[in-house]
Structure formats: structure tokens, C-alpha cells
């Protein structure tokens, strides 16, 4: 088990509560935006990589309806167990423990793919992007939601302050300070928007659009095969 995998096993029971508190509920809006930008029709097939407790997965299921098919994949068992408990009303969802770098499906299986706050945590970002490209049908779209690099130095300073002075102390209240302390260095190591878009194009995608949120504190990047 990797360090990141073990981290998500530990934080799973409180992950959603902390997301609500730390984003003031805005993560729900951003996840819905990511799903909407895929423009999936009813009956479509979709994949949610690094699905965690399944917020995005369930939004995809609502989008494609009961005639569609959605797979939620994560490498950690604990968040998947929570996701399964919450999916009684979503028979179109299949939950799967697996690796985002080697997804066990044939090429051109899915019409849409989401990955929310997951690409930053994989050990090989280019390989994850190549897998998304492989799995999509021609014309299919992938939506990547994650922290990003702010557009101004003032916002970057705010981002660092917010993470170190609000996020980590809030997590400390739940005994998870060490688990959330990794966020700031992980964001610093994440590709900048131009680099990320270039990596997506190198993976084979033809159209890439980057949408900064809150001045670039967060972003959704949409790529079409």
C-alpha cells in the first residue's frame, strides 16, 4: 500500500464532512460543473477515476440515468465501502477497487471520464492521461477537477495561508493534521495550467479547455478525444 493510499484509507470516514467545511460547500458546485461539461446524454457510459466516496460518481449516474452505466474506481478500500453504502438508489453504478494507471477495461469503453482531486495524487500523471485517452470513445470527454496555481501572487499567498492556517488546523480538530499537511506541497508539485494542458495534448487529446475557478485556486480542465 502506498503512502497516499494509506492516507485516504485513514481520512475516509471524515472526508466528506471536511470537504464541506473546508470548501464552504462549493465543491458540490464544481463537481456538478465538471459533469455538465462532459455533455453526456441519457444512457451514456461514464467512468469516475479516483472516485473516493462517490460524490462525482453519483452525479454522473443522475446525468446518464438508469439506462446508462457508470463505474467508480478508486485504489483505497475504505472510501469505496462508504460509496457503496450510499448507492442503493443507483443500480447503474459499479464500484471497483483498482489503479487509475491501469484501468481494467477495453479501449473506447466510456463516453465520459471524470477525475476529481485525484490526478494530483497519482504517481504518473502522463500515464493517467494516456489511460483516459485510451478508455474514451472518439469524441468523448474527460473533466479534471483539482486545486490549481492561482493567477496572481496575492492569490497564491492566500492559497498557502488558507491551507496552512485554516485547512490543517481544522483537520487537526479531527486528529488528521498530518494527513492534510500534504496538500500544499502536492499543489506546488502539480503541473501549472499550461504544462497540464500540454501533457493532455501529448496524451492524444485534440481539444483542451482550462477553466480557472476562484482566480485559479481551483480549476476544471476539459479534454476531448
From Swiss-Prot:
<dbReference type="GO" id="GO:0052624">
    <property type="term" value="F:2-phytyl-1,4-naphthoquinone methyltransferase activity"/>
</dbReference>
<dbReference type="InterPro" id="IPR023576">
    <property type="entry name" value="UbiE/COQ5_MeTrFase_CS"/>
</dbReference>
<comment type="function">
    <text>Methyltransferase required for the conversion of 2-phytyl-1,4-beta-naphthoquinol to phylloquinol.</text>
</comment>
<dbReference type="GO" id="GO:0042372">
    <property type="term" value="P:phylloquinone biosynthetic process"/>
</dbReference>
<keyword id="KW-0489">Methyltransferase</keyword>
<keyword id="KW-0949">S-adenosyl-L-methionine</keyword>
<comment type="pathway">
    <text>Cofactor biosynthesis; phylloquinone biosynthesis.</text>
</comment>
<dbReference type="GO" id="GO:0032259">
    <property type="term" value="P:methylation"/>
</dbReference>
<protein>
    <recommendedName>
        <fullName>2-phytyl-1,4-naphtoquinone methyltransferase</fullName>
        <ecNumber>2.1.1.329</ecNumber>
    </recommendedName>
</protein>
<dbReference type="InterPro" id="IPR004033">
    <property type="entry name" value="UbiE/COQ5_MeTrFase"/>
</dbReference>
<dbReference type="InterPro" id="IPR032904">
    <property type="entry name" value="MenG"/>
</dbReference>
<comment type="similarity">
    <text>Belongs to the class I-like SAM-binding methyltransferase superfamily. MenG/UbiE family.</text>
</comment>
<keyword id="KW-0808">Transferase</keyword>
<dbReference type="InterPro" id="IPR029063">
    <property type="entry name" value="SAM-dependent_MTases_sf"/>
</dbReference>
<dbReference type="Pfam" id="PF01209">
    <property type="entry name" value="Ubie_methyltran"/>
</dbReference>
